Amino acid sequence: MAYLSIRNPSGWGAAMALVAASLAATAHAGELEVLHFWDVGDDAKAAQVLKAAMQRDGHTWKDFVLSADGNGVPLTLLRSRVLSGNPPTAAQIKTPVIQQWARQGVLANVDDVARAEHWDTVLPKAVSDAMKYKGSYVAVPANVHRINWLWINMRVLRQVNGRVPTTWDEFFATAEAMKRAGYVAVAHGGQPWQDFILFENVALGVGGVDFYRKAFVTLDPDALAGPVMAQVLQTFRRIKAYAGPTVMGRDWILASSMLVKGRAGMQFMGDWAKPLFLAAQKDAGLEFSCVPAPGATKAYAFAVDSFALFKVKSAARVKAQKDFAAELLSPAVQEEFNLDKGSIPVRLGVDLTRFDRCGKQSGAAFDAAARAGTLVPSVSMALPPAIEDVMREAISAYWHDDRISAQATMQRLVAAARGAAMPPRTH
């Protein structure tokens, strides 16, 4: 560090000019504390895109990072921070929880940013509605993940003379061929959330869009405990025979690596798995295909990563918050962030030229499903965590314990729905 001498007045003048310029540049800079779960791998790489954008705007990014497997811990810590009057600037939370926070009056209104950036025009209505409370924006979306993907190791598929399945009959025929050839047909982890994603895929593929909405959006007890759900559960359990030995708590990345190494043939997983497959394609020559899960080729089950924006006190933090909201939905950030994340831009009209074929396919399918009315939210998008948690536990228990009947599981699903105290969502 260079020190200035009091014997050099010209040095003082230059220093004061430098300080003045620095103060002018940072007069509106603020700290942006963000609660998120993007702490490893490609998620962390994608988060760096957001950090860099905010740093270019002169703001300081502060991570409030929590493990995605923290169960109820993140919400507990967030609640404690909010109640103490010291909330983070933004928090990555699910859309039903956004509505809960909004009803408590602790979220910031960013309609001024939304109007300036034309959010009502550049966002799909199914997404923009979820970001609003009583007609005002209180949150900002980052991306769209497709949930109903089936990933296939094409070398394994060719070796067993299998075909890319579009129906469940075709799927089980392919799975049987892979199993007989000594492969694990379906790579699957042993975590409850993975069990539930697989179940969602089966429910949509077996029951169809109307059934899915009745069961998991409107919580119709006849759908949750009827003959179609019984068929869904039967199909779901049948897959278990092709998943190999289930290891409780096995991370999804370890399951995906089975596909990469050629030990497994297929995997049901959202498109956050894609960067891993793309890396393997580049480094190890992996040949993989991404196709809609069986039975739901025209449907698109989606999840959106979103940030609730909390009321903050200082003008500098408010400025940082508004800049964050604007930057997150800017075309440039949408493109770079989603290229790293494996998802697709939530903003309409972003150029997908640099995206891989799966990204382009996902974007086209999302638009087509929106037009056809076959766009459905993932359960995590549709239901509050308290209900989703009970349903997830019931489905995971059914998967891991063959002694549990489909009838008992359906009763647990209905009980979860009846215990739901869901105030009507207001947009």
Annotate the PLM regions:
Residues 98-106, 127-166, 172, 191-216, ...:
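Periplasmic solute-binding protein
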Residues 175, 217-248:
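Glycine-centered hinge/linker elements that transmit conformational signals in sensory
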Residues 30, 52, 56, 160, ...:
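Extracytoplasmic/periplasmic substrate-recognition and gating elements
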Residues 32-49, 66-69, 379-382:
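Extracytoplasmic "Venus flytrap"
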Residues 32, 56-125, 129-132, 158-166, ...:
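Extracytoplasmic "Venus flytrap"/periplasmic binding protein-like
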Residues 111-124, 206-231, 279-283, 292-299:
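Short, solvent-exposed loop/beta-turn-alpha elements that line the ligand-binding surface or hinge
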Residues 80-81, 87-89, 119-155, 184-185, ...:
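A structural signal for short loop-to-beta-strand junctions that line the ligand-binding cleft
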Residues 126-128, 288-291, 338-393, 397, ...:
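Long, aromatic- and glycine/proline-rich binding clefts that accommodate carbohydrate-like moieties
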